[in-house]
């Protein structure tokens, strides 16, 4: 599930109970703040809700992986994933728990979408 903006707690709970891996892409909105394309007063509630949802997903142990939507407006190739990781750490702190959680989500994606060897 990419982006997943505007989910509520019930949806996050259902996500945690499923095998779905959520790739939030926080920086697609966060990086727009202050650039003038949209008013910050519009962006800030969206950013806050995304951060709250990430925190809830972490608490409920939903499967989550990093992704940046690189190439989107203000999400530069090469830096987007670093920006996304920084956004995750600003919400959840810098911990082994975060690293393990992200690794589990990434491994779930790799396992499900593994190409068969010929």
PLM regions with names:
Residues 38, 48-118:
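His/Asp/Glu-enriched, well-ordered alpha-helical/loop segment
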């Amino acid at each position: 599930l990419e982006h997943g903006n505007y989910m509520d707690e019930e949806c996050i709970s259902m996500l945690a109970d499923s095998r779905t891996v959520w790739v939030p892409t926080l920086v697609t909105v966060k990086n727009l703040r202050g650039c003038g394309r949209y008013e910050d007063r519009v962006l800030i509630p969206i950013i806050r809700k995304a951060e709250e949802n990430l925190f809830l997903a972490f608490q409920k142990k939903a499967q989550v992986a990093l992704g940046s939507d690189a190439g989107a407006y203000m999400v530069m190739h090469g830096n987007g994933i670093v920006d996304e990781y920084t956004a995750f750490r600003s919400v959840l702190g810098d911990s082994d728990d975060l690293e393990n959680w992200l690794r589990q989500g990434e491994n779930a994606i790799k396992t499900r979408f593994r190409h068969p060897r010929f």
